[in-house]
Amino acid sequence: METFKSFDGLTSVNSNIYNYTDKKKGGVNFLIDKSYVPRGTGSSPRLISAYDNGKCISISPIDENQTFEIDLNEKIISVSAISSFVEINKYAFGFGLELPVVPGLQDITIGAGIATCVHGKNQFMYDFGSQIISFEILSFKNELIFCSEKINSEIFNLTIGGLGSTGLIINAVLKLKKISSTLIHRKKLGVNDSNEFLNFYNDSDSNLIGMFGWHDLHTTKKKFGGGFGYKDYLIPGEEILYNQSNTTIEKENDELPLKILSLGKYLFGSLFNKVYVLKENLKSNESKFNVYTGAQSSKGLYWNILRSNGFFEIQFIVPNANYLEFMEYVRFSLKKYNATTSVCISKPSKGEKGYFRFRGDGVNIDMTTLKSKSNFNFSNDINLKAISFGAIPNISKCSILQKSQIERLYGDQALKFYSDYQKIFGDEPPKWFLNNGLYDGKNL
C-alpha cells in the first residue's frame, strides 16, 4: 500500500497499486473490476486518481526511446496513453506540426488529458476532447474496446472528461495542426468593471488563439471585476520551414531582466530563470514573442516554485448564472479576513457533444494565496460556501466529487451522463467516481 498526498500536501490517501502490462509485449493482463481507480503512470498529484483504502491500476512508463506513428498527409499521430504532451510536441515540431491543445503542465500524459478533457488558453474555441480521433480502453470487464466518433461513440464521449469511469485508456490517435507562425502578437487590455469583464470574455474574434486575464476582487463595488486581460493573435508571414526527419525545432531562451533574474534566483533558486511567463506579465501593453516548447509549462513551473515557498492555489468551477454573485462573496470574504490573493478567470470551455465533461464548464477562479492564518481562514470559508452557490472546487485539483454537486452544477448534462452510462454498462459509474467517501462538509 502506498500513500499519496494532494497537491497542497494537506490531505493524503493510502492505496494499493496494481500494474497493467500489455499482453502483446509479453506481460500479464488480469481481471479488474469497478473498484479499481485508473491511475495511469501515477505522476498525478490529484487524489481523484488514488482511492482511499482502495485499489489503483497503473501503467508502467514506456521506454525512453519511444517512437510515434505520424501521418503527415492526414496530420494525425498515434501514441501511447502514457506519452506526455511535451514528448509528442517535441517530436511533432520536427515536421512543422503541434498538438492544437496544450494543458498547463507539460508532463501531463495523453491518458490524463483525455480523462479530464484538458484545455489551454484557447478553451473558448475548443478543448482537447475535440482533437481526439480514437483510442482503446481496457474496460472494468477486462475487455479492450476501440472507440471513435463512429465506433462505440457513446463510450468514446463518456470517456472524454469521464475521469476514468469507463476504464483504463491504453492508446490514442490525435489530431495535429500546422505551425503557421513562430510569432504571437499579445495585446494587453484594461478591464474596468464587471460589464467590461463580460465583454472581454465574450469576444468572438475568429483570429484569437488565446485569451486570459487577472482581475482584482479588492476593489470597490463600482470597479468590481476590474483588472487586465491578454488576447493572443498569430502574426502572419513567419511560417517555419520543416523537414521529414525526426528532429526538433528549438529556439534560444529569452533572458529575464537582470534585476528580476537576480531577485528571482535569490528568492527561489536557479530554476527561476526558466519562468519565462513572468516576463510576459511584466511587459508593456503590446508585445511580440516567440513561441517556445512548453510555453504553458513555465507557468506550471512558476506555481510549483511559489508553492514550495509557501503559496497554494485554489480553483473553483462556478455556474455561469452564479459567478458574479460568487465573485462578490469572494470579495466580501477577502475584506472580512484581510486575505491577500490574486484571481484568474478564464472563459468557460465549450462542450461540442453536450456530454458531461469535467474540464471547467462555468468560470474558473484561481486564487494564489500566501500561506497565513488569515488566508487559511479565508480559503476554508470559501470552500464551505462554494456549494451554496452551485460551485465546486476543481476536482482535477482538489479531488472533491459528490453526486449532489455534480447534478447541481451540470444539470441536464449530468443526467445524460448517468443515463447513457447505465444504458451502456448496465449500472451507475463506480462509487469512487460519484463520491469517494473521503471528503465531507467539514473538509470541503
PLM region descriptions:
Residues 224-233, 283-289, 351-363, 406-415:
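Short glycine/threonine-rich loop-to-helix capping motif typified by GTGT followed
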Residues 81, 323, 334-337, 364-366, ...:
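Extended C-terminal subregions enriched in glycine
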Residues 115, 133-325, 329-332:
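C-terminal substrate-binding/cap subdomain adjacent to the FAD-binding core in PCMH-type
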Residues 316-369:
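C-terminal structural cap/anchor segments
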Residues 8-107, 117-122, 346, 395-398:
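Glycine-rich N-terminal segment of FAD-binding domains in flavoprotein oxidoreductases
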Residues 300, 374-380, 387-444:
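Activity-critical C-terminal alpha-helical subdomain
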Residues 210-216, 311-316, 339-352, 393-399:
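A short glycine-rich, hydrophobically flanked beta-strand micro-motif that places a catalytic Asp/Glu
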